């Protein structure tokens, strides 16, 4: 058989024929060809392609291979079969499938004649090790052949031989010398195997070919590669090493890895920083790294060997375990140098991955030795360290003491579940650890809003002063570390780890989001923000307004909660008015700050939604503190018994569907009136400062149009007059002698009844915002805080399609569409949005865009995620329509204002 046409040669100086079918080379062959075409210092290769690779057993190969071995000598400065400076070879199988189980064959050319010359350069011990490594590969092939031929006796003998060789390789017992090993296994090998290096190579290739011949119906297109071996311990000027093309945590464009001087195997060895290698070699390694990055558009892991001054690229592969920061910084670097365009950059990052950039990550070297427990439900990804406290009050007290004493203020709130009264603790905590609920539970939603970490551990038992998980006890005041990655298993560590803090600027997040925003058209993202700080963060992350300002969160601040409680428990209008004036001034300052930060953008203020039940003092400690406050402020107060009686009267069995939202406005009109006055006082104050403000007032938990009509326009019945928003605005405007501003009043659609009567509600609402957390609860009859207790069973029996508090349920989607259609029939220009944590998920965003909503609103920390999801949806839609996606962003610096390729 004439095999010459099926043998090919490649090196960094000699490329393969372009007409050659690359499918015949296998994966490794194609990679070697690709790298050689880049001019990288790859090992030269003889490639026996797939047309003959299974048919070489019995063929004379020496004459066909010898010319190529001489080419190896010219490049490698060593000669095959030379006694003094022998070149050794490896035989590599190159299948077309990435997953294969072929043995690796190294060190051909080690014979009785060449062993001494090789040992003189690398040492007797290492040379002997390489003999055993050669034997391991060959006997692996022989075992495969014996099993294919159903030669049970031969297979058994090879299995025992391989076991013995493995013991020698692992140093389990005193091994024979290299020459003794050649004699020891001589009878099991082809004749002359250790007598003639050319016979050895020829027999090795034949055996590999024979092994492949048994797989005619299996692996398709396996090539055989022959390459020279190079060693990092081959005398002076020899090194080995491994590195990443840039830092895989920070993304800094600097090699990250180690090198080893005069060593071949880096295992169990302490290396030196690769950047400290000789400058000439460092320059070569940098050129290799960044050529690979530009070509693959990925961070690469590179293994190299420098043998007697010559540098060789041994292996390169993508890096799976890298941070999102490193990926983003790589993409931005490629974009600035016009290697990729903005579209490629935006498509290369999954929206959820941005969570990692927005929160701290653990320095994994700092958790060695810490006890840990894996598992749990992701509330908010990231990492948090802090001392554990089991009530909001105990956490706040510990935080205050630590702050005053200049000590570590990091705290983690650990409770079964959290409620509105716990928000003040979440705000100062670094994270929340709970055992009820999941992604959409109150603890997770609030933590997300404040940029905190949240982990739910259903298997954790929480007591009054301790928690137990996986047999580990967490006492109050103990340090723990929460590691909640975007992908992979969450981990709870006992003790404090070191954290790497995020920086939106240096991480590249701000620049990345600017590129993504270039693809965003009319559909946009707003933020849920309750303070000027939240508003600033929202703008920094690319929000185009505030879609939800939860005013009840403002009342839970420490200096306000007792004022609000005093208002609730007031016995007469005079007392209540005094408290409301205090609250109005406080809220007015909040609104002023938020409007000022968001000048030029819409700000949606949701009037009080939380039930009064949530503002009541709970537990003996809160009751005592409130009684002390009343005594101090009023000079007199309620008795404990009177207070407990009033608390009982106001307590509700099911507050989520009870006295909340617009229902409070009907029963306590002065509360909403106070809030509306605070809004417009802030608006007209800013008007005098020449600052543009676009206020939107949203009424929550609307059930029918009559509720909204009364709140907006007021109502008079015999003996009663209800003042509407319009009348209050006019009152404030006239008192301040201001010019009327445009404002909108809208309804939060979070009940099926509201969705179905949207046409009637739209007569009085200029916008709808779909509150999908409550709409999901009221549509499906599910509690978001309790769903996870039975969700595993429902998932096991395939009774639900995923988590409806993460991905919108089909029936909730239908209600949204019905409400949109009916609302637009009544008011064609009605503005439509969705607020809540559903708004940051790609699947939900695509739905909102498809059905024609105008925006989504989510926590400030979710804004970049939502923007990226929108940009990717716009790109995908353009591709489906066969057009180039419209992009209105900044071109790379190199392009001088032109759009990058």
Swiss-Prot record:
Region listing for Disordered, in residue ranges: 879-901
Top-rank lineage group of the source organism: Bacteria
Keyword GTP-binding set for record: no
Reaction(s) catalysed (UniProt annotation): pyruvate + phosphate + ATP = phosphoenolpyruvate + AMP + diphosphate + H(+)
Protein task: Catalyzes the reversible phosphorylation of pyruvate and phosphate.
Record note on quaternary structure: Homodimer.
Name recorded for this polypeptide: Pyruvate, phosphate dikinase
Organism: Treponema pallidum (strain Nichols)
This protein's encoding gene: ppdK
